[in-house]
Amino acid sequence: MRKITQEACRAFENAQNYKKSNTKVVRINEVSAEMYLHGNLIAYSDESGIFISNGGWSSNTTKERLNGLTGVNIRQVNYRWYLNGDFWNGGWIRISD
């Protein structure tokens, strides 16, 4: 995992602001944050959990950033993404605890 991914995911999971290169985490409040990649929202958290999306881009960088989050395991087989073993079209989904 790249250092930028580790730093961004740590900031996201601790609801702290972070900005480096193409990745930004915005603290909303003490329990909520949003993660952006190239200006596209790819993850947000609130009191009900963590939600992810590919932001419309099935790129290796998007996959890498999301895979840095706790509870996320995205794999690609024949250009199709699988989230925690199940096919995923990249739309918004809540990550189970």
Can you describe what each PLM-predicted range is?
Residues 1-97:
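Terminal leader/tail segments of proteins
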